[in-house]
Amino acid sequence: MTAFTNRLQQHFYNSFKSEVSLHCSEVLTQGLQEPSLVSSNALLAKQLGIDPGELTSPEMLQIMSGNQIPESSQPIALVYSGHQFGVWAGQLGDGRAITLGELAVGENATLWDIQLKGAGPTPYSRFADGRAVLRSSIREYLCSEAMHGLGIATTRALCLIDSKTPVYREEVESGATVCRVAESHIRFGSFEHFHYRQQPEAIKALA
């Protein structure tokens, strides 16, 4: 077991679930068949205190593909509401993103979310399959790092995983996962959700 894998197994924080449980739902990941590492972000790994070489380990591949849930993880999907195409759409939520937990980083022990996109359906998937395909995952992986390089606040991608899992879109494509990392995945719609439900205490808890 690598040092980073041990951190994931033993030292995940789950503060969002424990402190603002109304804002999320428990969920389990659904793994990918025959996962393989496409790319890993060495610069981000170092920022998180991770040896970049650890991202290539078999244990890490199983976690980042959703095949194994770390012992200390309590996976969740976040609920939010908002507008789509200029129209109020009501409740939305993480339809294909699952937050595994938070890691303490640096001397100040800043908590960073570790989230998998494409690891299966959640209570907010509606009629979708909760999957991501390699084509769009490559785009997110590259664009998020480009935005970061331009100084635009964004989530970042730690690694990109391909697989033999078939995902049905306009044609059959290969399923993939992106490991997203951010200090928070709370968005404006997280507050809107409880504003329109007239639950001010939930808004205060989130703030």
Regions inferred by a protein language model and the residue ranges of each:
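TRNA-binding/sensing appendages of the translation machinery
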Residues: 1-64
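Conserved ATP-binding subdomain of kinase catalytic cores across diverse folds
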Residues: 34-37, 43-55, 59, 65-207
